[in-house]
C-alpha cells in the first residue's frame, strides 16, 4: 500500500489512466531517494551529535569518529529490518509510547519550573511571527523554513505514513484515516510546542547569540539548563527517536523500491544494505549538508502525493460520507457489549 498504489489505482478510476503508472513510479522513486534524507542520514546525524554531546562534546573520543558510531548504528538497524515489517513493528510499538511519554513529562517539568517565562515565550512566538518586519522582508523565507521543519516533524503531505497504515488489517479504511490525522497533532501541536516553550524559557537568548547552537544540541542544552540530571535520559530518548524513525523509513523506502522492480528477497536485501550504508554516511557529514539534502528530497516526495490528494479528493469525500452514514445508522459497530 501507500501513495504509489493509490495514485495508480485512483487515477485510473478518475479516467486518468495515462497518468496512473507514471505518477505511481514518480512517487516510488521519490520515496526511495527521499528515505535516505529525512528518515536516514538526518536521523543518524542527530543521534551521533547527541552521543558526542553526552560523551564530552568537543573533547569526546568520538567527535571525529562518526564512521564508528555510524557503522554500529547501521549494524543494529540491520538486525531489526531483516525481520521485515513485523520486526520493525515489534520494536517501534514498544519504544515510541515510552519515548513520547518520557519526553512530554520532562518537557512539562522544565516549562513548569520556568512558568514565569511562559507568558513572554508565547508573546514572543506571536509577536515575532506577525510583526511588520517579519511580514514584509522575511515572511516568505520563514514560511519556507517553517514548512520544511513541519514536514520533518509530522511528514504531513509526504504520504509516507500511508505506507505504514496500509499494513493495518481493517474493514474501514476511513477509521484508519482518522487515526492518521492524530499523528500531526501529537507531533506538532503537542511535542513541537512543548519543545519550543522549553527552548524559549531556557536558552533562547544564548542560542541567538551563538549561531553554532542548533539541532538536537539546542534542545539538549535547554533541558540541561534546568534539569542537570536530564542530559543522559534525554540523550538516550533522542537516540531512540532517531533509531525508531530510521526503522520506519527503511520500510517506506523498501516498499517504493519493490514497487519499481518487483518483490523479491534479492531486491529487498540490496535496498536494506544500501540503506544501512547511508546511515553510516549521515554520521560523517555536517548537519547543514544533511539538511539541504533532506529538504530537497522532501519537496520532491511531496509533489506526486499532494497532486494525488487534490485529484482524489472527491473519492475521499464520498468514502467519508458513506462511512458517516453507516456509523450513524448503527450499521458499523465499534464496540460489542459484554454479556451479563
Which role does the model predict for each range below?
Residues 1-18, 205-224, 255-261, 321-328:
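Flexible loop linkers connecting adjacent transmembrane helices
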Residues 23, 27, 31, 44-51, ...:
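Membrane-interface loop-to-helix entry segments
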Residues 107-124, 135-137, 167-168, 182, ...:
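Extracellular/periplasmic helix-exit of transmembrane alpha-helices
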Residues 1, 12-14, 56-57, 156, ...:
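Juxtamembrane helix-boundary/capping and inter-helix hinge elements in multi-pass membrane proteins
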Residues 16-33, 69-72, 133-153, 190, ...:
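Select transmembrane alpha-helical segments in multipass membrane proteins
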Residues 12-23, 238, 242-280, 311-340:
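C-terminal membrane-solvent junction of multi-pass transporters and transport-like membrane proteins
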Residues 8-45, 51-73, 77-80, 237-246, ...:
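Helix-loop-helix module between adjacent transmembrane segments
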Residues 80, 111, 150-155, 159-173, ...:
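Helix-loop junctions at the membrane interface of multi-pass solute transporters
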Amino acid at each position: 500500500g501507500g501513495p504509489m498504489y493509490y495514485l495508480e489505482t485512483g487515477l485510473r478510476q478518475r479516467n486518468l489512466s495515462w497518468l496512473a503508472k507514471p505518477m505511481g513510479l514518480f512517487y516510488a522513486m521519490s520515496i526511495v531517494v527521499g528515505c535516505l534524507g529525512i528518515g536516514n542520514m538526518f536521523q543518524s546525524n542527530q543521534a551521533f551529535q547527541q552521543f558526542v554531546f553526552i560523551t564530552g562534546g568537543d573533547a569526546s573520543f568520538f567527535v571525529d569518529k562518526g564512521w564508528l558510531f555510524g557503522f554500529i548504528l547501521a549494524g543494529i538497524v540491520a538486525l531489526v529490518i531483516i525481520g521485515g515489517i513485523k520486526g520493525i513493528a515489534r520494536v517501534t510499538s514498544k519504544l515510541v509510547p515510552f519515548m513520547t511519554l518520557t519526553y512530554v513529562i520532562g518537557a512539562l517539568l522544565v516549562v513548569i519550573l520556568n512558568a514565569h517565562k511562559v507568558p513572554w515565550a508565547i508573546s514572543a512566538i506571536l509577536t515575532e511571527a506577525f510583526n511588520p518586519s517579519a511580514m514584509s522582508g522575511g515572511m516568505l523565507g520563514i514560511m519556507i523554513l517553517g514548512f520544511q521543519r513541519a514536514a520533518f516533524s509530522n511528514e504531513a503531505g509526504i504520504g509516507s505514513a500511508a505506507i505504514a497504515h496500509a499494513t493495518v488489517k481493517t474493514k474501514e479504511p476511513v477509521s484508519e484515516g482518522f487515526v492518521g490525522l492524530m499523528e500531526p497533532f501529537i507531533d506538532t501541536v503537542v511535542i513541537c510546542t512543548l519543545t519550543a516553550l522549553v527552548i524559549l524559557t531556557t536558552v533562547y537568548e544564548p542560542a541567538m547569540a551563538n549561531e553554532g547552537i542548533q539541532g538536537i544540541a539546542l534542545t539538549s542544552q535547554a533541558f540541561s539548563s534546568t534539569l542537570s540530571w536530564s542530559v543522559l535520559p534525554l540523550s538516550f530518548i533522542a537516540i531512540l527517536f532517531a533509531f525508531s524513525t530510521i526503522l520506519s523509513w527503511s520500510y517506506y523506502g523498501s516498499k517504493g523500491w519493490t514497487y519499481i522492480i518487483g518483490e523479491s528477497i534479492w531486491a529487498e536485501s540490496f535496498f536494506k544494505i544500501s540503506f544501512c550504508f547511508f546511515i553510516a554516511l549521515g554520521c560523517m557529514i555536517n548537519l547543514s549538508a544533511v539538511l539541504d539534502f533532506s529538504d530537497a528530497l522532501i519537496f520532491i516526495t511531496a509533489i506526486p502525493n499532494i497532486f494525488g490528494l487534490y485529484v482524489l479528493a472527491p473519492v475521499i469525500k464520498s468514502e467519508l460520507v458513506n462511512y458517516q452514514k453507516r456509523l450513524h445508522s448503527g450499521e458499523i459497530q465499534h464496540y460489542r457489549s459484554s454479556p451479563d
